[in-house]
């Protein structure tokens, strides 16, 4: 069912919808309703993305979104690289601010270990909203104070274990003990 007067009446497959839109307008611009249909989200979600400046759109008589911008938004929708907190980038790597996942990748340790270190206070991090933000200086301090000690302990533990292993000649079996007592 297709109703040209009311945009909310579109009931077409996603692939056909994108082609129809190109044919109708001659450009690659879509309305909010069409964008919502293409991505299986509500119109409200598209409005919110526009207001948060995560999705580029222009408004002459109605909101129009370029299909390229819509695809770019879809690819980066869950990316935290563009996350904002009070108008500034949350994880600005140029300023030395990193997310927990980025820190875990940099140090080569599991993400849960970074969360544990921030909770216990061994790695200082700052909460901005729901996210932990960790500075470069803190990453360097944690690496030098804790990770280097752990690798030293592991290396020391390996040498202790090597000395603790007995040679086969030095071991005494229970059978020989039984016969020696007689």
UniProtKB/Swiss-Prot annotation:
Designated name of the protein: Early upstream open reading frame
Family: Belongs to the EUO family.
Lineage of the species this protein comes from: Bacteria, Pseudomonadati, Chlamydiota, Chlamydiia, Chlamydiales
InterPro entries tied to this protein: HTH_17 (IPR041657)
């Amino acid at each position: 069912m297709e109703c040209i007067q009311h945009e909310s009446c579109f009931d077409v497959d996603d692939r056909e919808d994108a082609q129809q839109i190109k044919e109708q307008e001659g450009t690659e611009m879509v309305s909010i309703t069409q964008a919502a249909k293409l991505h299986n989200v509500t119109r409200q979600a598209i409005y919110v993305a526009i207001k948060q400046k995560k999705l580029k759109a222009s408004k002459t008589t109605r909101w129009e979104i370029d299909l390229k911008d819509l695809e770019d938004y879809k690819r980066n929708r869950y990316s935290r690289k563009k996350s904002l907190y009070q108008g500034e980038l949350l994880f600005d790597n140029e300023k030395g601010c990193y997310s927990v996942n980025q820190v875990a990748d940099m140090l080569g340790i599991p993400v849960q270990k970074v969360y544990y270190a921030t909770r216990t206070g061994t790695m200082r991090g700052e909460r901005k909203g729901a996210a932990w933000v960790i500075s470069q200086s803190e990453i360097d301090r944690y690496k030098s104070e804790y990770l280097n000690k752990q690798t030293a302990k592991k290396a020391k533990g390996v040498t202790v274990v090597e000395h603790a292993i007995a040679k086969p000649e030095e071991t005494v079996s229970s059978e020989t003990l039984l016969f020696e007592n007689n």
